[in-house]
Amino acid sequence: MVVLYQGCTGDNVRVIQEALGIDVDGIFGPITEHFVKEYQKNKGLWADGIVGPKTWTML
């Protein structure tokens, strides 16, 4: 499983953005990180803005 964080780009980032319901551009920038953190908080995960195995599973 791919770990994604700010600065990453590509199709996996697009998948995350689509799942979060935000604009899809394939760039994991500050906006994507913000929404990842919000998602993680809402799901009771550690809100670090990094999409690792636990966040992938929840998405």
Segments predicted by a language model, with ranges:
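Intrinsically disordered, low-complexity Ser/Thr-rich linker and spacer segments
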Residues: 1, 58-59
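Catalytic phosphate/metal-binding cores of nucleic-acid and nucleotide-processing enzymes, i.e., regions
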Residues: 8, 12, 46-48, 56
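Short capping motifs at secondary-structure boundaries
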Residues: 21, 42-45
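Conserved hydrophobic/aromatic packing and binding residues within compact polymer-binding modules
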Residues: 36-39
